[in-house]
A protein has these predicted regions:
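C-terminal regulatory/effector modules of DNA-binding transcriptional regulators
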Residues: 88-159
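Short, positionally conserved secondary-structure boundary motifs
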Residues: 3-89, 116, 123, 127, ...
Length: 159
């Protein structure tokens, strides 16, 4: 009923959850909504065997400004199953902080030659180990690796 919806609206206003522009009907603003920045999805990254790295903007995903915090971010769509034990599944969209450095154990997007892959990063005994999170895949051991960035979040859509 109109009386009930008016009472609910008034209660939400009193709690500071919404505000209304007085004198304008049907104008309700939700308070505390964080602003977003659109981050480009630059293509696919292998969670499996490395795939050729090609940057091509597919679309954009909204990322809260509190996650961005002035950092340069990009996104990649996951292809493959090597990171499923870390909760990263095919078609997930990884939000990546572009940086050339990472700590041991962090999940990174790495360039091995001209192929990109997402793995857990370890620097050890004069080489680098890119460790999958799926027992069906072997680690990638290399003497040289270029880090494209650290995975800081992911977006998953349910269809």
């Amino acid at each position: 009923s109109a009386a009930h919806s008016s009472a609910v609206r008034k209660a939400l206003e009193e709690k500071g959850l919404i505000s209304r522009e007085h004198g304008v009907n049907r104008c309700i603003q939700i308070n505390g909504m964080e602003k977003n920045t659109d981050v480009p999805v630059l293509g696919r990254v292998a969670a499996g065997y490395p795939i050729l790295a090609v940057e091509n903007i597919e679309c954009y995903v909204p990322v809260p400004d509190s996650l961005k915090r002035g950092r340069e971010l990009f996104a990649l769509r996951v292809q493959g199953e090597s990171m499923i034990n870390a909760g990263i599944f095919p078609d997930d969209i990884l939000i990546v902080h572009r940086t050339p450095v990472a700590e041991n154990g962090e999940i990174v997007v790495a360039l091995v030659g001209d192929e990109a892959t997402v793995k857990r990063f370890y620097k050890e005994n004069g080489h680098f180990r890119l460790q999958p999170e799926n027992d069906n895949f072997e680690p990638i051991i290399v003497d040289e690796v270029a880090l494209l960035g650290k995975v800081i979040s992911l977006v998953r859509y349910f269809d």
